[in-house]
């Protein structure tokens, strides 16, 4: 099943809000950050292309990151470059 950026933002922000007791706007920003990381793009691009569907590999990568976040792992730990010093 193909998921659009818009559907992911709506559904997964609600999941984060419930699971981690985040405010809805904070949860939406976190989902945007995960999508930006997976798609290697900017927030502006995400907002301009809500109809874009994730490929299977993008969806798999995103789902893995989301599960880590739902378990409470800080988003900064997931998004930091492995080459950061």
Task: Please name every model-derived segment.
Residues 1-27:
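Non-catalytic nucleic-acid substrate-recognition regions in nucleic-acid-modifying enzymes
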Residues 4, 30, 61:
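Amphipathic alpha-helical recognition patches that constitute DNA-binding helices
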Residues 23-37:
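Hydrophobic alpha-helical packing segments in soluble, helical-rich domains
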Residues 33-85:
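Conserved AdoMet
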